[in-house]
């Protein structure tokens, strides 16, 4: 009888532990989505931008872009149009800007970039920019 009780307790404990992993698990597709977003970022943005803090290229670094006031990095020489832009980057504004930068900030210095037409690709880039690996 003692053996049966111990055996039942061990099985119950094992089943409980299976249901409650010690480390929070990320959905399997989240890593794939970030990787896909990084690939899209690399194809559409990386020529001029990086996500490394302080590493400006032709364009400013996009580290922690969401929540940042437009044209506000002290270490980058923005166009007067971007310096004068009176908004804070959020996902919606970033989506519209990536699609048609001249409509959001006329006079920006992003020529010859004309925008990223695919809403799916823009969403991938934005998800990548807000991911913990880039912030």
Where are these regions (language model features)?
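Residues within well-ordered alpha-helical secondary structure of globular protein domains
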Residues: 21, 43, 68, 100, ...
């Amino acid at each position: 009888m003692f053996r049966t009780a111990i055996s039942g307790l061990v099985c119950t404990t094992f089943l409980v532990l299976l249901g409650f992993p010690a480390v929070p698990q990320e959905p399997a597709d989240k890593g794939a989505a970030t990787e896909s977003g990084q690939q899209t970022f690399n194809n559409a943005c990386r020529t001029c931008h990086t996500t490394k803090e302080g590493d400006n290229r032709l364009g400013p670094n996009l580290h922690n872009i969401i929540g940042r006031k437009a044209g506000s990095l002290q270490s980058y020489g923005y166009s007067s149009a971007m310096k004068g832009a009176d908004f804070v980057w959020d996902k919606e504004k970033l989506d519209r800007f990536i699609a048609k930068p001249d409509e959001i900030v006329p006079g920006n210095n992003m020529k010859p970039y004309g925008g990223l037409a695919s809403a799916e690709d823009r969403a991938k880039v934005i998800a990548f920019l807000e991911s913990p690996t880039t912030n």
